[in-house]
Amino acid sequence: MHIKQDIKKIRVSNADIEHPKFAIKNQSKQIYITAKEGNFLDKNKILLNKNVKFKSNDFSIETETVIFNRNEQTAKSNTKTYFSAENTRISSDGFDMFDKGNKIFFYGNAFVVLK
């Protein structure tokens, strides 16, 4: 029967959320956040995994793992991070986004290209 073959094709995920979408909003911009998977750590903190992207009109950030705090509108990553803006490229070992996305600290081994 085809049922056994179909059962083998089903992928079981440990994620609480598949393809989560969030936004950080401040007075001047919105930063949209997407990922492939997410897990609730508590009421406000969500662990975002796999292909995590932050996108605004001014910049984008890509990494693999982020802890996003919905209440405080903050994000933190300890994985390889790629930042891109019109005249700036930054590669770092992680970042800390706070003040509703107005401030971003990049840390670890960082490589900056200014055009």
Predicted feature locations:
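Mature-chain termini and adjacent capping regions
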Residues: 1-115
